[in-house]
């Protein structure tokens, strides 16, 4: 651990545990100055959450009228990032875990003046292969890794939580706007999400930011890659993404028709 990182962690911990501060301003990065919950991953506040190269490429995709689906929105990082550019479009943020939803709502309230056109819509359910009720793990020690995939290697003994879920294709049929970009970070359920978006992928060909989780479900990465290649997508592995857990990989996926 470098000295700066140590000092930043120490500063956050003192403010959280000694001074009982629930929120601090983010130190650096694209969300510098945003107020953020101190109980979340400290990398958010340090401005080091997610890979810089990935963020740059995603920002190049975003336009003022983009429709952005944030699947596995957690506490809102990518939704806030997209909102910096999307002025006339819409951001659907999907997050089923109540604790994350509560923090996301507090971030919306605390950063209200920074949010352009109030276009972030928080959807409190999961996205999967079909409309159904799924049972999530609800482990507070695994706040960013809870999943409904029964075979997950990380599904530790914990409380369970029933949540509603729906597919992307069903959502569009029921009035949700067609996505231009879909971010998928759903802890091993990414293949289910793709299965529930077959029509959308074939007809509308949205761009994808896909996180695969072999750490949850061994082989899920190759399964998703093969699925998308059959659908005509070209994938780019983000080599510079610094993942702390083996089996986590990020991909940018664009349909071949959009490259010509």
Regions found by a protein language model. Name each.
Residues 69, 92, 123, 164, ...:
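Conserved Rossmann-like nucleotide-binding pocket used by diverse enzymes
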């Amino acid at each position: 651990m470098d000295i700066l990182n140590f000092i930043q962690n120490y500063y956050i911990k003192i403010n959280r545990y000694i001074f009982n501060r629930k929120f601090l301003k983010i130190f650096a990065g694209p969300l510098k100055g945003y107020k953020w919950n101190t109980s979340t991953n400290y990398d958010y506040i340090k401005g080091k959450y997610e890979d810089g190269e990935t963020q740059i490429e995603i920002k190049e995709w975003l336009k003022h009228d983009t429709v952005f689906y944030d699947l596995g929105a957690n506490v809102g990082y990518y939704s806030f990032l997209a909102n910096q550019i999307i002025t006339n479009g819409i951001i659907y943020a999907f997050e089923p875990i109540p604790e994350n939803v509560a923090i996301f709502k507090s971030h919306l309230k605390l950063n209200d003046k920074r949010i352009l056109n109030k276009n972030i819509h928080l959807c409190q359910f999961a996205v999967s292969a079909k409309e159904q009720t799924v049972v999530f793990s609800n482990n507070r020690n695994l706040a960013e890794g809870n999943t409904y995939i029964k075979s997950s290697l990380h599904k530790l003994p914990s409380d369970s939580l029933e949540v509603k879920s729906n597919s992307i294709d069903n959502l569009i049929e029921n009035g949700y706007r067609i996505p231009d970009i879909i971010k998928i970070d759903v802890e091993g359920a990414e293949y289910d999400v793709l299965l529930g978006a077959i029509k959308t992928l074939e007809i509308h060909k949205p761009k994808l930011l896909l996180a695969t989780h072999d750490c949850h479900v061994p082989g899920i990465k190759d399964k998703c890659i093969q699925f998308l290649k059959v659908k005509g997508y070209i994938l780019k592995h983000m080599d510079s993404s610094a993942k702390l857990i083996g089996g986590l990989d990020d991909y940018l996926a664009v349909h071949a028709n959009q490259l010509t």
